[in-house]
Every structure is written in structure tokens, then in C-alpha cells.
Amino acid sequence: MNPNQKLFASSGIAIVLGIINLLIGISNMSLNISLYSKGESHKNNNLTCTNINQNDTTMVNTYINNATIIDKSTKIENPGYLLLNKSLCNVEGWVVIAKDNAIRFGESEQIIVTREPYVSCDPLSCKMYALHQGTTIRNKHSNSTTHDRTAFRGLISTPLGSPPTVSNSEFICVGWSSTSCHDGVNRMTICVQGDNENATATVYYNKRLTTTIKTWAKNILRTQESECVCHNSTCVVVMTDGPANNQAFTKVIYFHKGMIIKEESLKGSAKHIEECSCYGHNQRVTCVCRDNWQGANRPIIEIDMNKLEHTSRYICTGVLTDTSRPKDKTIGECFNPITGSPGAPGIKGFGFLNEDNTWLGRTISPRLRSGFEMLKIPNAGTDPESKIKERQEIVSNDNWSGYSGSFIDYWNDNSECYNPCFYVELIRGRPEEAKYVEWTSNSLIALCGSPISVGSGSFPDGAQIKYFS
């Protein structure tokens, strides 16, 4: 075949292919037009439109059927604000729900040095919160961690029952004093940082900085070292500024979404307030605090969360629960501190004032931070002559204890009442064990109430401190 024949043959093939493509295109166009026309004729028969409003999390499904429009709205409820509508459960004994054994693990693991731990819950779980020292136990920076206030401290949270490590701890905020609570929707946290005479409290809501509070007495602004409490979107916090051994200046501060909505200076007969352990019930908040100036009996603050008002006084019983403390008294005081030697300085503690089911916690030793016991004292909050009815040992007196405080899982739907819970800090190292180590840290145990009587047992820290030498 000569070149001209090849050219004509190729052109013929190209023309045939082009015609075939054209016919295919025409048939496709006809099919699309037909389908579109059928779709248009039935378009209004059954159309579903879904609108999601992210703010209110409301889904609206609109069904169009011929000429009738039917709206069906389904509200997807966010967890609502916590309402303190229940009373405290009756308790017949206490059971351990968590023990992290942090110091025992710390002999070989990289456990973070902490103090001032506490427990706080949200709708999903309960966690431990603690103020770290910016180091681990086996790190040389752990030397001299007896100091309460340094620039290296900050609040962390860890799963309850797990010792705090770098990998399992979540950073919350910088500071050397703290409180934190959940309002049912988001968590509010306060940390105090800076110089003793010029400190600042930072307030966070949903992990975002919302406001700050500057010292008002220029003498170690400080707060609870345990959880605050919220009701109907308002969270209440007790803060103190001023001397630890003289008249100080305490405020009860109310927050909404991390913003201050009201402040009250301390009212009532309490002479000195520090490190309150608070719990909610019956639309009220009760705080059991520390009088570091005079009283071996604990002051209490009672807060009406509807009126946003408070008053203060002392636990009435003559059974004293601060450390150091003199011997128990036959008759207590409701409106004045009970003094005596040994007295100051005091320790953070707690109690659950529930009429004839009242329980108070204290160290077993009246002088040292050792041992821990729970005492059932009916009507201790109101009766100066109330006496110990039951006693449960938590930590034997030959083991170190420390701070203690209250917490409640307000979102436990298995109960029609709030089950009281508490934790005990188990301090190890300096100052009591200074001949072995240069650091101060702690482990933690947490306990909750049982509706029936329980057995016995002691739950100390359990670490052999000489292994760290």
C-alpha cells in the first residue's frame, strides 16, 4: 500500500470512530434528560432535609410529602448543669475504692513528686488532682521539695488509682495552690501562682483562661486544696489571704463559667479559715475547714446556693479533729474556737455533717500527721455534748498520713442520694524521714461510704523509705 492509500485508510477509520462517539454522546444525553424529568416529577413526594444546630445540638428532620410539611424535632441533650437536689446517703462504714501506691512504684519508676492531692469527679469519671514539683522522685531536682510555693509547681490530673507519671498525667495550670470542680457541662479550675506577697489566681473554664484574681492582703493568697462545688451553673470557692497565725481575710466567691458573679467577705463566727473541704447537698454547700490560728475544732461554712449567701461557725462537738490538738472536751463550742496545748498550726481535714449520721475524720495522733480514723458522732455539727458512737481505723498510727478532704460523685445515677467519699494523703520523705531522703512526696487512698457495716483494715503508704537511700 502506497503512502496515499495509507492516509485515506487512516482518515476513514478516524471518521468512523468519530461518528460512533457522537452517537454514544447523543444517547447519553437523551438518557440523562429522561431521568432528570422523572426525578423532577417525583421531587416533592419524599424529601428529607436535616439541619443540625451546633449550639443547641438540636436535629430537625423536615419531611415534605405532597403539599404537607411535617417537622419532627429531636433534642439531643447535652449533660445538664449539676443540680444539688439530693441529700447525703447514710453511711455505716468506709471502703477503699482507690490506692495508687505512688511511693512504692517510685523506687524504680519515674513517679512525679506531688503534694496536696485531691479527688474530683465529672459526668464520666473521677480523677486525682495534685500539685507537682516539676520533678520525679529519683531525679536530683527532687531535693528540697519540702517547699510549698515554688515557680516549678503546677496542677496535674491522673486516672484515680494510678501513680502520677509524665506519660499518664495531664497538665492543668501553673501554681502552688488549687481547686477544681465540674458544673455538669465543663470544669472550672483555679491555680494560685507568684510571689508570697503578690500572688495571682488564674481561673480556667473548659481549659481556657477566663479571669484572674490578684492578692487582696499581700500574704499568700490561697484556696481549698480540694474540689469546689457547683449548683445550677454556679460554682463556689473559698479563698483566704493574710496571716496563717492571726486574723486573715477570707472570701466566698461565686463563679459562672469561670467568671466572678459575686464575692462575700467571711460572715459568721469563724475566726480563721483555710483549706476548706466542701461538699454539696440539698441545694446547699457545706465546707469543713482549718482554723490555723486558734481552734482545734474545725470551722464550717454553710452556703445557700439559691440565695448565694453564707454563714460560718464551728463544729459543735467536743471531739476535736484538727492536728495538733488538745484532749477531747466533754462539751464543745459552736461559735468559738477551742484552744489549748498543743494547738496550732493545724492540718487540712473534712467531715460530713448529716445529723445522726455525721462522720468526722482525723489523724490518730493528736500531735503528728500519723494514722487516720473515721468517727461517727451523731449530731456533731449541732450538739456540743455529742459523743463518738463508732470508730473505723483507716491508717494505723505507726504510719504517716497527711491532708484529707471530701469529694462526691454527683453523677452516680445508681443512688437516690449522694454517697460521701474522702481521700487521705500519705506523706513520705522530709521532714519526718529526712535521714533517708531529701524529697517530700505522697501517695493517696480514696474511700467511699458503705450502706452496711464493713470489716477492718489499715491502708498505709507501705513504701520502705530506706530503699531510696
Swiss-Prot record:
Residues 36-85 are annotated as: Hypervariable stalk region. Substrate binds at R115, R149, E274, E275, R290, R369. Its EC number is 3.2.1.18. Residues 88-469 are annotated as: Head of neuraminidase. Ca(2+) binds at D291, G295, D322. Pfam families: Neur. InterPro entries: Glyco_hydro_34, Sialidase_sf. Residues 28-469 are virion surface. Glycans are attached at N28, N32, N46, N55, N66, N85, N143, N198, N232, N399. Its main location: virion. GO terms for cellular component: host cell plasma membrane; membrane; virion membrane. Its cofactor is Ca(2+). Residues 1-6 are intravirion. Disulfide bonds join C89-C417, C121-C126, C181-C228, C230-C235, C276-C289, C278-C287, C316-C334, C421-C448. The chain crosses the membrane at residues 7-27. Homotetramer. Intact N-terminus is essential for virion morphogenesis. Possesses two apical sorting signals, one in the ectodomain, which is likely to be a glycan, and the other in the transmembrane domain. The transmembrane domain also plays a role in lipid raft association. The influenza A genome consist of 8 RNA segments. Genetic variation of hemagglutinin and/or neuraminidase genes results in the emergence of new influenza strains. The mechanism of variation can be the result of point mutations or the result of genetic reassortment between segments of two different strains. This is Neuraminidase. It comes from Influenza A virus (strain A/Equine/Cor/16/1974 H7N7). The gene is NA.
